[in-house]
């Protein structure tokens, strides 16, 4: 029996019975469903589609969490440029626009999943009508719906949205084996999810923020497993630090006797180099 298991993400292009069966036959041990791109009813349908074809395969439901996305018009930014965003354009909820968990001068805002780096020079107004002025450190083209990261801020209160809670209820009712919790920052985030799911579902903490990496031991103690989510982790940390962070996550999981998962960008290099 292989000690290392394979998780395969399935979506619209791979939800046919033939492809699901082929994925499992090829060695997939767990099929992952990403809640970021499907509503709650669609999630239920996808779970049942997998169960109908291969009831023996485990399912991991990956909830969206507090992911921010740019909702403004496409723009191109030049190095050194000063520009302004509204809170609405950055997708900021009230808890991340003001107060203890809000934006402060000198903090970074990363756009297009880290490709564009800016630093805050001014925050004006109150949510939802306020705005933030930034200086561009590394420019580029920004398209609508691209990711926004705030590596220097911490989400205060619950990391769960109303959609996350509805998706967790579906996962519980459909007896899903694993749930991945996005943008975990502290052990209480996992405890909140576990209180909603009950004792039978395994809770996986996705480590993709610096705050979670600092608390990795405590998070491991309340989780069934941890995932080194290299995509967002590589955005919020300097890229040269990611291999060491990934190693730390895996070693801490082993020491605590919980599952360790390495995920995202696993095959991305093959799009440009088939021998990478």
Where are these regions (language model features)?
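Non-catalytic helical/linker scaffolds that mediate oligomerization, partner binding
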Residues: 1-276
């Amino acid at each position: 029996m292989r000690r290392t298991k394979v998780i395969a993400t399935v979506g619209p292009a791979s939800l046919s019975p033939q492809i699901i069966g082929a994925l499992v036959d090829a060695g997939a041990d767990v099929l992952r469903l990403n809640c970021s791109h499907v509503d709650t009813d669609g999630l239920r349908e996808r779970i049942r589609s997998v169960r109908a074809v291969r009831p023996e395969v485990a399912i991991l439901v990956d909830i969206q969490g507090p992911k921010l996305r740019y909702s403004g018009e496409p723009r191109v930014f030049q190095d050194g440029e000063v520009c302004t965003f509204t809170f609405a354009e950055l997708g900021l909820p009230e808890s991340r626009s003001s107060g203890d968990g809000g934006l402060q001068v000198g903090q970074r805002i990363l756009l297009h999943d880290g490709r564009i780096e800016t630093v805050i020079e001014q925050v004006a107004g109150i949510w939802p009508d306020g705005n933030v002025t930034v200086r561009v450190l590394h420019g580029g083209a920004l398209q609508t719906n691209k990711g926004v990261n705030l590596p220097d801020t911490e989400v205060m209160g619950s990391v769960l949205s109303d959609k996350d809670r509805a998706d967790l209820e579906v996962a519980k009712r459909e007896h899903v084996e694993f749930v991945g919790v996005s943008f975990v920052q502290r052990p209480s985030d996992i405890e909140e999810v576990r209180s909603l799911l009950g004792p039978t579902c395994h809770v996986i903490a996705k480590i993709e923020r610096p705050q979670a990496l600092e608390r990795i031991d405590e998070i491991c103690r309340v989780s069934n497993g941890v995932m080194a989510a290299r995509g967002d982790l590589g955005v919020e940390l300097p890229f040269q630090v990611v291999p060491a962070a990934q190693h730390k996550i895996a070693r801490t999981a082993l020491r605590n006797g919980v599952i360790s998962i390495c995920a995202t960008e696993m095959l991305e290099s093959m799009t440009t180099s088939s021998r990478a």
